[in-house]
Amino acid sequence: VILGINTGGKKEALTIQVGDNESSKYWLSVLNELKNRGVKDILVICADGLTGIKEAIGAAFPKTEYQRCIVHQVRNTLKYVPDKDRKAFATDLKTIYQASDEKKALLALEHVTGKWTPKYPNSMKRWKDNWDVISPIFKFSSVVRKVIYTTNAIESLNSTYRKLNRQRSVFPSDTALLKALYLATFEATKKWTTTIRNWAQVYGELSIMYEGRLPE
């Protein structure tokens, strides 16, 4: 599922896809479908480390920034950390992604890496490897950052889909599955009637950051 925020500050479920062959070719077809349906521009795409997504974005929407999902980045880091250290480790990770600018974030990254790597050798490798797609977040204010990396809406949808899966574990075809997903999405998105919090401030900042790409 791809969730977007329109220029009016409201959330929209843009597309639902069923596929098991994630690649740059696959994601390019998904993004091109959005273009064909009228999506003219995307400022930022926030996603997990999906195979080929960065290349597909560059081809379909060359001006769009790809931001690695911070929530998934943190989850992947803590995946193999035992409970006794997880809370302290998570608190230290916050010093990276909640830093006021990239320079301070890099200092925090070095500190956290030095502290935890001796105990969990591979835990911080993905942060350094993925820094080019983690770091775009630091040019935004805290208000805009929350819009970009808050996953409440998408997690709510995913929870709806998991509930659907528990109710019926087998679907006779992809078409049957898509129909069920569309109905569940339609019901879930009925509640999306309000604008994003602090949208006027967010819109103003984005208008300056991405000059000429948003309506006056």
Show the residue positions of the predicted features.
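A generic short alpha-helical patch detector that favors 3-5-residue windows
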Residues: 19-23, 45, 66-69, 81-85, ...
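Acidic/histidine-rich catalytic cores and adjacent linkers
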Residues: 95-216
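Hydrophobic/aromatic-lined pockets within catalytic cores
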Residues: 35, 39, 58-62, 82, ...
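RNase H-like nuclease fold core
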Residues: 1-46, 51, 55, 60-63, ...
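Conserved beta-strand -> loop -> alpha-helix junction used to position metal-binding or nucleic-acid-contacting
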Residues: 44-51, 56-92
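A short, charged helix-loop
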Residues: 18, 77, 88-92, 96, ...
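Short, conserved catalytic/metal-binding motifs centered on acidic residues
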Residues: 11, 45-48, 69-72, 127, ...
